[in-house]
């Protein structure tokens, strides 16, 4: 077993390149929903960046992967998760908070 790969550790996550961190990181409904409050939805910078590059900038998943330093498959998973979270936020009227995971390299190019 290679050094640093102890039991239960799994594979180390690659660093992700984030070119434009979100300017607004917390979204919430203007009118609270009826009933008990639901927990907020958490979106990662990786999911946000994949959504921004593919749906907003119009890049292919392969191009987005190159920009982020990850595989096209990882972009696909992040994009699918981000789209589901945005839909869930809109349909259920829940808060959405965008947070870093700690494995991002933020390169703000404003």
Swiss-Prot record:
Protein name as catalogued: UPF0251 protein PH0803
Family under the similarity heading: Belongs to the UPF0251 family.
Signal peptide: none
NCBIfam families: PRK04217.1
Domain of life assignment: Archaea
SUPFAM superfamilies reported in the protein's UniProt record: Sigma3 and sigma4 domains of RNA polymerase sigma factors
A Pfam family this chain is assigned to: DUF134
Disulfide bonds: none
Alphabetized Gene3D superfamilies for the sequence: Winged helix-like DNA-binding domain superfamily/Winged helix DNA-binding domain
Provenance organism: Pyrococcus horikoshii (strain ATCC 700860 / DSM 12428 / JCM 9974 / NBRC 100139 / OT-3)
HAMAP family hit by this protein: UPF0251
